[in-house]
Amino acid sequence: MLKIGVVGCGAIASLITKALMSDRLNKAEVLAFYDGNLEKAEKLAMETGADFCRSLDELVSKDLDLIVECASVTAVEDTVIKSLNNGKDVIIMSVGALADKDLFLKLYKLAEKLGRKIYIPSGAIAGIDAVKSGSLGKISDVTLTTTKPVHGLKSALEEQGLNTDEIKEPKVVFEGTVFEAISKFPQNINVSVVLSLASRYPAKVKIIADPNAVVNRHEILVKGSIGTIKTCVENNPCRDNPKTSALAAYSVIRLIKDLSEPVRIGT
């Protein structure tokens, strides 16, 4: 049995937990929750029968195998460091934090030193297995074009001074590097960092706000010595959190299942 603790108790954490609870094979179980908003953690703990923790330190000190970070980019560093130092492996959902090269290296070296693992799920995009394999050759270009409903980008756009009510047709709201993208859209474009890490090449990112869109669309183009990789995924937004795709949560569930099963498919 894989014993799991969860940091961050929003819609994604709830979806992951309930999916694992419904798994008939029962090879993984969420046993404890923590959130900076204690009411959220207590509510999810009561709904699932798991432990409610009042601090991150309390959570990572428990008898757990794996910590799943579902909180925010700002929570990643503290969560991962404390988890690793307490003998736990970690899944990072807010992978945008790893656009910070210094932080990535810091966490990488700590995990290596302690003999622990940091897992980064593929998230809401397809083709990461092929991109990882292709990165063993020479990559010459990586491009991500993401189209989302305006309401899914609303908070990030308004922070940049854009009136989302004035967007009446598809509008390019960002075009630049992965580092700029995750800085301006920290809750919307984690996939750009996953893609960049998998390819070992900084992705060029374009974000389109579409008032008529009902899905989150991610188009990937990777060119290199292995040839060309093109993928396009149209994801349904998470029902309770339209900033992200339901597939992002399912990628974590699949990863947890892979960790608890004897056969793993794919790179």
From Swiss-Prot:
GO molecular function, one term: NADP binding
Pathway: Cofactor biosynthesis; NAD(+) biosynthesis; iminoaspartate from L-aspartate (dehydrogenase route): step 1/1
Positions of the catalytic residues: 218
UniProt superkingdom: Archaea
Gene Ontology biological process terms from the UniProt entry: NAD biosynthetic process
Record key words, sorted: NAD, NADP, Oxidoreductase, Pyridine nucleotide biosynthesis
Enzyme class: oxidoreductase
Reaction equations catalysed: L-aspartate + NADP(+) + H2O = oxaloacetate + NH4(+) + NADPH + H(+); L-aspartate + NAD(+) + H2O = oxaloacetate + NH4(+) + NADH + H(+)
InterPro entries to which the protein is assigned, alphabetical: Asp/hSer_DH_NAD-bd, Asp_DH, Asp_DH_arc, Asp_DH_prok, L-Asp_DH, NAD(P)-bd_dom_sf
Residues where NAD(+) binds: 124, 190
Note: The iminoaspartate product is unstable in aqueous solution and can decompose to oxaloacetate and ammonia.
Entry function: Specifically catalyzes the NAD or NADP-dependent dehydrogenation of L-aspartate to iminoaspartate.
Family: Belongs to the L-aspartate dehydrogenase family.
Protein name per the record: L-aspartate dehydrogenase
Gene source species: Methanococcus maripaludis (strain C6 / ATCC BAA-1332)
Gene (name only): nadX
